[in-house]
Swiss-Prot record:
It comes from the Eukaryota. GO terms for biological process: endoplasmic reticulum to Golgi vesicle-mediated transport; Golgi organization; lipid homeostasis; lipoprotein transport; regulation of lipid transport. This is Surfeit locus protein 4. PANTHER family: SURFEIT LOCUS PROTEIN, SURFEIT LOCUS PROTEIN 4. It is a multi-pass membrane protein. The chain crosses the membrane at residues 64-84, 92-112, 179-199, 203-223, 242-262. Keywords: Endoplasmic reticulum, Golgi apparatus, Membrane, Protein transport, Transmembrane, Transmembrane helix, Transport. One of its GO terms (cellular component) is endoplasmic reticulum membrane. It comes from Danio rerio. Endoplasmic reticulum cargo receptor that mediates the export of lipoproteins by recruiting cargos into COPII vesicles to facilitate their secretion. Belongs to the SURF4 family. The gene is surf4.
Amino acid sequence: MGQEDMMSAAEDLADQFLRVTKQYLPHMARLCLISTFLEDGIRMWFQWSEQRDYIEATWSCGYFLATCFVIINLIGQIGGCVLVLSRNLVQYACFGLFCIIALQTVAYSILWDLKFLMRNLALGGGLLLLLAESRSEGKSMFAGVPSMGESSPKQYMQLGGRVLLVLMFMTLLHFDSDFFSILQNMVGTALIILVAVGFKTKLAALTLVVWLLAINVYFNAFWTVPAYKPMHDFLKYDFFQTTSVIGGLLLVVALGPGGVSMDEKKKEW
């Protein structure tokens, strides 16, 4: 079987998967995407005093402001997740979750940690894709804004979301000299570049979903670590952040790459 035959067979398999799951895939994608916000909101409830004390000690902002921070995070994240899953006011929910990401980036000094900053940006990319999906279902927020043909804001959101998802992958690269790590990096980098430029997008994104899912379950198995150990919370954070990016990739699979992509441009050639 030649290379083209293998690629064609893989694309047929991906199309068959999409046909079988097309009714459920967007729901699964949204649930995965908001999972990190849902987990963090629930954690805010159960670790109320610890989170408040941490913010008060770090920023010396006093009891009241620290409590306000926890309340905003709790209500903003749980409320945003409920709106997204119920498909009500999704655009406002996305903007609220964007604000939560920005607030946490500053409050937890993520700006100075490149790895966590890239993951937060990738999470923002997933929200951009969710925003694009909500625009395809409901009324445009940009009604009255002059349109440039096919280059609508939705398509640029899809492009921005795809590019930001690349950042999550970059944090997973292993700079080891063994053959498996080098092969893993090369194949993964090729796939994420295909997703970013929008070439063979659905197949590349679906392959990345399977790959990230395997890595997530293997490396971030927080359920195997006792809850009292700090590593438990660290692995749980990693697990749900990666799950959210998987949700973003599933949205790419469900929606396609959008107009600003090589897949769409090929149709014009």
